[in-house]
Regions:
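Predominantly soluble domains enriched in secretory-pathway, periplasmic, or organellar proteins
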Residues: 1-154
């Protein structure tokens, strides 16, 4: 189990069998959203200072990549089928990163959204076969709060 400790600039790693706790120090700050690729031993972590999408090897605890990302990231999801990472941030964008191999990632898309829209949900393929990405857009003086729905495509 992985737990963000943003005030300490660390990730706690809890062994569920032994209850031992290890800590991975970070060189980046304000680590908040995380997603796990358990099959390939990769942990994806969004940071605020600076805005990065960091990739960790869960077997060694080493950071293997850190790419510039959306500011004020709140949610981050891993799409195992497409080998993609989706990251929503209050800066007003959804960043999509593509994994080319276990050590290499690149920015695939930077989709404009709405300033302050940073809370998101991605649940993979739904009952009707569509894959949806949901984004909560906060209320403004000229309109109420909304949920924007995106269809994930190859």
């Amino acid at each position: 189990m992985y737990v963000n400790l943003p005030d300490l600039k660390q990730i706690a790693v809890i062994n569920r069998s032994t209850h031992a706790i290890a800590r991975w120090p970070l060189t980046l700050e304000h680590n908040f959203p995380m997603a796990l690729d358990e099959a390939d031993h990769r942990l994806f972590v969004g940071t605020h200072e600076p805005a990065r999408m960091a990739v960790f090897d869960t077997q060694s605890g080493q950071m293997i990549a850190a790419l510039p990302s959306v500011q004020d990231a709140d949610d981050l999801y891993y799409d195992a089928g497409r080998k993609r990472i989706y990251m929503a941030g209050g800066e007003g964008f959804i960043y999509t990163f593509q994994q080319s191999d276990l050590s290499h990632y690149q920015l695939l898309a930077k989709m404009p959204t709405s300033l302050g829209a940073r809370t998101a949900g991605y649940f993979g393929k739904g009952k009707k076969g569509f894959e949806r990405f949901f984004l909560a857009v906060p209320a403004r003086a000229d309109h109420g709060a909304e949920i924007w729905i995106y269809t994930v495509q190859d």
